[in-house]
């Protein structure tokens, strides 16, 4: 057996450490997700691809919600996303509302909704009706 601490790599190659998140092109931490999967007692063993996939799904969901919340903030002429914008974004999107239907968002408020029976009756305008001339 030759070598020492080279770990099977050629002794001349110097490679900087690269995180699994950067290898996968993700912003969410793959290492942390892997640790949480192991410590959470979800299964005895966790595959190498599972935390990468889960981190990618979480990043996609976060990006989707933040995009819709940013649109809601812009509609309200605000530059900062607040919980109300998150609530409006989630409840107005059919799939996100189904996914997060039982989730309560603190300081989110409610969706504006007025029942049709409570709205004022629409009446015909006096100038638009049939003429009363003979």
From Swiss-Prot:
Residue spans of biased composition, Gly residues class: 1-10
Subcellular location(s) per record: Nucleus; Chromosome
Source species, domain of life: Eukaryota
Positions carrying N6-acetyllysine: 5, 9
Record site feature (Not ubiquitinated), residues: 121
MF GO annotations: DNA binding; protein heterodimerization activity; structural constituent of chromatin
Pfam families (UniProt xref): Histone, Histone_H2A_C
The keyword Zinc appears for this protein: no
Recorded coiled-coil stretches: none
Domain notes: The [ST]-Q motif constitutes a recognition sequence for kinases from the PI3/PI4-kinase family.
Free-text function comment from the UniProt entry: Core component of nucleosome which plays a central role in DNA double strand break (DSB) repair. Nucleosomes wrap and compact DNA into chromatin, limiting DNA accessibility to the cellular machineries which require DNA as a template. Histones thereby play a central role in transcription regulation, DNA repair, DNA replication and chromosomal stability. DNA accessibility is regulated via a complex set of post-translational modifications of histones, also called histone code, and nucleosome remodeling.
More info: In contrast to vertebrates and insects, its C-terminus is not monoubiquitinated.
Protein's name in the database: Histone H2A
Gene: HTA1
């Amino acid at each position: 057996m030759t070598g020492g601490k080279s770990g099977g790599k050629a002794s001349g190659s110097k490679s900087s450490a690269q995180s699994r998140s950067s290898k996968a092109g993700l912003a969410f931490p793959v290492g942390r997700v892997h640790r949480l999967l192991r410590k959470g007692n979800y299964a005895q063993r966790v595959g190498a691809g599972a935390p990468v996939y889960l981190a990618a799904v979480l990043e996609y969901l976060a990006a989707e919600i933040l995009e819709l919340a940013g649109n809601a903030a812009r509609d309200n002429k605000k530059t900062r996303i607040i919980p109300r914008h998150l609530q409006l974004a989630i409840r107005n999107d059919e799939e996100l509302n189904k996914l997060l239907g039982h989730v309560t968002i603190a300081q989110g408020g409610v969706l504006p909704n007025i029942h049709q029976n409570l709205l004022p009756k629409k009446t015909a305008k006096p100038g638009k009706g049939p003429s009363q001339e003979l």
